């Protein structure tokens, strides 16, 4: 018996009412973009608005949309979005609805609460995890903090006319972390070890050549790993000390002075890891896979050297239209893989005269 075809499906709720059937005959395309870090995830829906006798009712800005994607009834909830932009175009007449992910379940406020500026200080030796938990509680959110990030002890921090989310992003970047508000949770994880809004680790997705429609890898030594130098001030000795991560050229010296050696080392390590990751970038497209998430890990196997290996997703775009369901991915090479690529290759064996050519 022939296998039944697998059909992509979606479900869309507007203010908790199911509108899937209502928009089905008008749907031109649906695109969900999952971004790494603070960049807002976005939902874009394009509808045919060609019949003047039956124009589509304009959805109010601030309306909540809940999207689920999958195949043949096996749907996975993607997230909650707030409509913030409408576009009407012609000809033919079309309506495009754009909505951004909201960090708060059941909230029309979007990011506004986290974006309000504040002025305050955080005392020396405050653990990073305590900062995240305090801010999460202030916004009635649940903190989900990776243990390796929670234990980082901070020097004195001043939050001067700075929003809570900008302050957290600044701290996360300093220690090579990623902060993301989603679904009522404030998630802080080490870059490349991200978690879902529920706090679960994002599973590794394994891909072989048959899974992929096309791919492109860009390799560059422009930044290289090199050496990153960070400075800290030794108060008792009244002198500047340095911490080095990596080796060789190019040498990058961080301009900021740090208050303790462990803070300087963490900053240097974060910058070094970021430089190494930027040496190799991947873009690929494939049939739709809702399990591919930004900050998730890909394991490519069976490709040529330089492509096979571990990658960290920086952006995943899921598109559904009359051509089917597709996923497009942008990724950076995982730090350990990229570091291995920078090592000098073993010297080629010396060629001998009169030796006949050989083949594998």
List PLM regions with ranges.
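Short beta-strand-centered interaction patches in the first periplasmic/extracellular domains
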Residues: 94, 101-104, 145-213
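Extracytoplasmic/secreted envelope proteins and their assembly/folding machinery
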Residues: 80, 129-132, 165-169, 227-228, ...
